UniProtKB/Swiss-Prot annotation:
UniProt KW Transferase keyword: yes
Signal peptide annotation: none
The protein, known as: Serine hydroxymethyltransferase
GO process annotations (BP): glycine biosynthetic process from serine; tetrahydrofolate interconversion
Annotated gene: glyA
Residues annotated as binding (6S)-5,6,7,8-tetrahydrofolate: L121, G125, H126, L127, S355, P356, F357
Primary site of residence: cytoplasm
InterPro entries: PyrdxlP-dep_Trfase, PyrdxlP-dep_Trfase_major, PyrdxlP-dep_Trfase_small, Ser_HO-MeTrfase, Ser_HO-MeTrfase-like, Ser_HO-MeTrfase_PLP_BS, SHMT-like_dom
Length: 417
């Protein structure tokens, strides 16, 4: 018999120590990695529930195992909420991650060797949009598109590449692009060559849900997203579509299960259902509006202090610092800011002279700081501290002074009160 009072601390001290140290790290560091966020205790409660025990291969009402009457309710709640939140008429909540969702879309609609247009990773794209080190770049013939001199997507070049290469699919979406994507224009280009238009909105799903960023669902044939990042739910994936193409929906479902996955993670799907309900609350819209305001506030400070921002600004939750002119590598900037308890990630910039392991840029995002209560004033102050560190990247005294300020503001604005 299993006793509910069993706990990790009494059984596995080494593991518990590492877990507790991570709790302290999250509370005492300012998180600026654009893909990270803090999920709610309600989501964590769902993920730690007895739903983790249940195998449920198949879909609600069509399972291969018995005893699924209650997990069917859980999954259907998640499906219905996803459709309502994003204005879709199809949703699959089973993908274990955003990458798994993308795998399912590719395998449902493409054959190995098919041509695909995806955003260049160095211009803000994602590994799963055709990077040669990823399955997408190995299985398919990838033609990259990118940004123009102004830092915006070059739609003329995209249309030209589409006409020349006649891809089977065009991918919209990004991991380090700070502009607004013209989904309608991309669909127009896809339709002109009879290609699938697939959008990966993982980074902006929360902004989309709150009406702060344009919704791709009415324009794309298929949309995928993660359920964490700006959506602030559990780590997982989601597939959406609109238009009533039942044949497409069947292909997508079959591609997820049994095509690429076995049993769904019911405890995570419950967490998704909670997060999707939270995203329907008025407070969530206020939060997402603040995310965008905070990112703009930080950009303004970096520009005032003489730092270059790719695209010259941001219209979402993230932006990219280009450090080429400062003769600072992204790797060194990441490390110095880390010593001041500010967490970022090094990131390639367009035409980066450095390798992806070194880079000349830093990606910065505002979802996590906003979640813990930062407004524009704190965001501007934080950006100033970051400039102090980068201006004096080898001065440990400056880094220590900034660290003490970080610790003070983290104590004032805890993640979990």
């Amino acid at each position: 018999m299993l006793k509910r009072e069993m706990n990790i601390a009494d059984y596995d001290a080494d593991l518990w120590r590492a877990m507790e140290q991570e709790v302290v790290r999250q509370e005492e560091h300012i998180e600026l990695i654009a893909s990270e966020n803090y999920t709610s205790p309600r989501v964590m409660q769902a993920q730690g529930s007895q739903l983790t025990n249940k195998y449920a291969e198949g879909y609600p009402g069509k399972r291969y195992y018995g005893g699924c009457e209650y997990v069917d309710i859980v999954e259907q709640l998640a499906i219905d909420r996803a459709k309502a939140l994003f204005g879709a008429d199809y949703a699959n909540v089973q993908p274990h991650s955003g990458s798994q969702a993308n795998v399912a879309v590719y395998s449902a609609l493409l054959k190995p060797g098919d041509t695909v247009l995806g955003m260049n990773l160095a211009h803000g794209g994602h590994l799963t949009h055709g990077s040669p080190v990823n399955f997408s770049g190995k299985l398919y013939n990838i033609v990259p598109y990118g940004i123009d001199e102004s830092g915006q997507i070059d739609y003329e070049d995209l249309a030209r590449q589409a006409e020349i290469h006649k891809p089977k699919m065009i991918i919209g979406g990004f991991s380090a692009y700070s502009g607004i994507v013209d989904w309608a224009k991309m669909r127009e280009i896809a339709d002109s060559i009879d290609a699938w238009f697939f959008v990966d909105m993982a980074h902006v799903a929360g902004l989309v849900a709150a009406g702060v960023y344009p919704n791709p669902v009415p324009h794309a044939h298929i949309v995928t997203t993660t359920t964490h990042k700006t959506l602030a739910g559990p780590r997982g994936g989601l597939i959406l579509a609109k238009g009533g193409d039942e044949d497409l929906y069947k292909k997508l479902n079959s591609s997820v299960f049994p095509g690429n996955q076995g049993g769904p993670l019911m405890h995570v799907i419950a967490g998704k259902a909670v997060a999707l309900k939270e995203a329907m609350e008025p407070e969530f819209k206020i939060y997402q509006q603040q995310v965008a305001k905070n990112a703009k506030a930080m950009v303004a400070v970096f520009l005032e202090r003489g730092y270059k921002v790719v695209s010259g600004g941001t219209d979402n939750h993230l932006f990219l610092l280009d450090l080429v002119d400062k003769d600072i590598t992204g790797k060194d900037a990441d490390a110095a800011l880390g010593r001041a308890n500010i967490t970022v990630n090094k990131n390639s910039v367009p035409n980066d002279p450095k390798s992806p392991f070194v880079t000349s840029g830093v990606r910065i995002g505002s979802p996590a700081i906003t979640r813990r209560g930062f407004k524009e004033a704190e965001s501007r102050e934080l950006a100033g501290w970051m400039c102090d560190v980068l201006d004096n990247i080898n001065d440990e005294a400056t880094i220590e002074r900034v660290k003490q300020k970080v610790l003070a503001i983290c104590a004032r604005l805890p993640v979990y009160a």
